[in-house]
Amino acid sequence: MPKAKTHSGASKRFRRTGTGKIVRQKTNRRHLLEHKPTTRTRRLEGRTTVSANDTKRVNSLLNG
């Protein structure tokens, strides 16, 4: 059986940490930021972990 290919869209969106958790960027911080409050854009900074319900699905896309 050939090797399974990693889902290229998922590999660009998700990253696995050293402990095995999957992290992602938060949404709503790409464009049209001028009308959004600064508190909201600051809250959306950085990364967050993928929910436990989605972890299994994302793992299969990343061949985990």
Swiss-Prot record:
Cited SUPFAM superfamilies: L35p-like (SSF143034)
Domain of life: Bacteria
Ranges where the record places region Disordered: 1-22, 34-64
Residue ranges with Basic and acidic residues bias: 34-46
Cellular component GO terms, alphabetical: cytosolic large ribosomal subunit
Biological process (GO), any one: translation
Keywords, sorted A to Z: Ribonucleoprotein, Ribosomal protein
A molecular-function term among this protein's GO annotations: structural constituent of ribosome
Alphabetized PROSITE patterns for the sequence: RIBOSOMAL_L35
InterPro entries documented for this protein: Ribosomal_bL35, Ribosomal_bL35-like, Ribosomal_bL35_CS, Ribosomal_bL35_sf
Biased composition (Polar residues): 50-64
NCBIfam families: rpmI_bact (TIGR00001)
Name the record gives this protein: Large ribosomal subunit protein bL35
Organism of provenance: Mycolicibacterium paratuberculosis (strain ATCC BAA-968 / K-10)
Gene assigned in the entry: rpmI
